[in-house]
Amino acid sequence: MRGELWLLVLVLREAARALSPQPGAGHDEGPGSGWAAKGTVRGWNRRARESPGHVSEPDRTQLSQDLGGGTLAMDTLPDNRTRVVEDNHSYYVSRLYGPSEPHSRELWVDVAEANRSQVKIHTILSNTHRQASRVVLSFDFPFYGHPLRQITIATGGFIFMGDVIHRMLTATQYVAPLMANFNPGYSDNSTVVYFDNGTVFVVQWDHVYLQGWEDKGSFTFQAALHHDGRIVFAYKEIPMSVPEISSSQHPVKTGLSDAFMILNPSPDVPESRRRSIFEYHRIELDPSKVTSMSAVEFTPLPTCLQHRSCDACMSSDLTFNCSWCHVLQRCSSGFDRYRQEWMDYGCAQEAEGRMCEDFQDEDHDSASPDTSFSPYDGDLTTTSSSLFIDSLTTEDDTKLNPYAGGDGLQNNLSPKTKGTPVHLGTIVGIVLAVLLVAAIILAGIYINGHPTSNAALFFIERRPHHWPAMKFRSHPDHSTYAEVEPSGHEKEGFMEAEQC
């Protein structure tokens, strides 16, 4: 009996020894720092650690994930292993690829190899400093859950994603692979190129130089907007450390940002409204990790706006506190670009303590103040004479050049201004134009049939060869965009050019 017990003890000891970790296994947590990403959600910061006990092969990529936002830092891996750092920022998951990671090269879009009909060199932006121009996409791009068809490309290495143009383009609502004081007009080799093939829109700042830092060399990088909402930053040439770039004349940022606008009565000007901009989310990347041949990929996460029914909204398991607004037929957390309507229609109070069954017996037509209003008509704006912008400051003075097609230069009207007056004015204008054309035709027929009449003699005395000559010559080097202000005079703030 004792022999059997002793044998059992030996077996258990050997089993325990076999299951215990061997020396040297696991992670080699040496000193140093790797990729880092920082997501800013008001008052939220925490550090993530690598999961212990996972053995990585020497040539395998090691992945770290932070599910709470905040700051993510990793130790340097031994040998020649590369890394991918993944960070969850509530709205996006960012993956940062180091220079030696093969996927970073795959994310670079070779514009030179693309279809030439889909590639355009923006001649205005390529020859100016602190300019911005609107471009229409060939597809709806979901940005923070909001479908966008127009974006604004700036010479300063970023894309402005806002619907309403204001003076602080660099402050918020941007996609910034590397926002800095770039001057494409410094060199003939500097260009701002964009490419659109229907599924991806790419903007490339090619061989651009920093204003006042031209001796440091040229920068080449791009931002890609994919139709599924993914955003990619790819860096080909970064000749200097990004933290060394001065921000005294222009903000220096890398990341994403979005905001909503609120209209409030202006205390200074009667019957006017003040537009205040509130940034509700920002993703900041560590600028020290922006190097040549690196890349960042942002994958969008589901938001409340994607739910189109009350049942789907209320049963959502997202981290957002989704609520259903029956008046607007919209699912929202209350913090998005449509917050103005959410407040105006009392959606926050409507959703308190109510279930989807409570809305089924209500008359939808009577419940909605304006049944023709679409939840996706954009930000609520005003037609008042005065408009102010609060709560944002910047050192930038980028000017805006309107898109050649003239789209998107005026603000959207509020729901109450849409409807019969617009259609009635259009009809009256068409009728007047038809009557004018008919009158001219009848006058021509009459004059041709009565050459000795007073009207015919009046026009004969004033025949065209007595009129002063007025010729329009085409100047290939002249800009088709309106001048923002006289050359040599520059003032702070963004200026929007009026289209001629």
From Swiss-Prot:
Residues 1-18 form the signal peptide. Residues 448-500 are cytoplasmic. It comes from the Eukaryota. N-glycosylated. Detected in urine (at protein level). Detected in endothelial cells from colorectal cancer, and in endothelial cells from primary cancers of the lung, liver, pancreas, breast and brain. Not detectable in endothelial cells from normal tissue. Expressed in fibrovascular membrane with increased expression in individuals with proliferative diabetic retinopathy. It is found in: Secreted. GO terms for biological process: angiogenesis; spinal cord development. Residues 20-39, 46-78, 359-379, 479-500 are annotated as: Disordered. Residues 19-426 are extracellular. Residues 47-60, 479-494 have a biased composition (Basic and acidic residues). Interacts with NID1. May interact with CTTN. This is Plexin domain-containing protein 1. The gene is PLXDC1.
